């Protein structure tokens, strides 16, 4: 499935465009210009056109900054899709920083790289918090890995620890986002074809990327859900969220927030995959979010 000729042409044009923009972004980033936050969106918008990605957005993007966007994660394509819509940096696994080319691009987009070991969690939380204190917009993929695109996996609530922070005396704004790859050349992408877009499990990146480059035009639906915060999630869960909640309440509120985000995102993905038809809301998991 797909055209090797199309794949080769797209790869060459993509590399040409990328190597043209890399030195520009490196200079504005080193100089501390505000353009360093905005240039990646222009770069990724062009990349979407080059790669045949038709991005369809629904919902309003929360205007407040700082903000933490929470999204499901299906493929490396998610980065280009989201960054074509909003000026953001990503919270990514540390090993991505060592990937050829993609690691460099992640650094130029001011990504925050985190280790999986729990011993590093406080340092990572402080680093993310410092970025938010500077008014940044960050994206977290709390599934911790990519999925097959047919479902949203449990969220790791530990990644929501930064949501306990306040911004200008108010709880940090959180906005869930759903991403779904729904059509190929105008035809619905069924469950059996979704692995052509989703990258997960033991799939090799070079081979999968080559197949993606050879495909036609992929329609990606991105849904921005209503914003919320940890205080709102705590209140909805029946927790006593006062001015100084205890550790147990904070932990429970973090899990409640993770599940509210996951429920909204999973429902959005399900509706997109169903062609926009209404589907039953996805209830929070009874056992709570994964730690």
Predicted regions located by residue number:
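Soluble extracytoplasmic domains of inner/organellar membrane proteins
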Residues: 128-129, 136-138, 142-155
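Cytosolic-facing loops and C-terminal tails of multi-pass membrane proteins
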Residues: 236-247, 255, 260, 266-291
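Short amphipathic alpha-helix with an adjacent loop that forms part of the alpha/beta core around
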Residues: 59-62, 127-133
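Residue-level preference for the first positions of well-ordered beta-strands
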Residues: 66-68, 137-141, 173
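Catalytic core of membrane glycerolipid acyltransferases/transacylases, capturing the structured
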Residues: 18-26, 30-34, 49-50, 65-119, ...
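N-terminal membrane-anchoring alpha-helices
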Residues: 1-56, 284-291
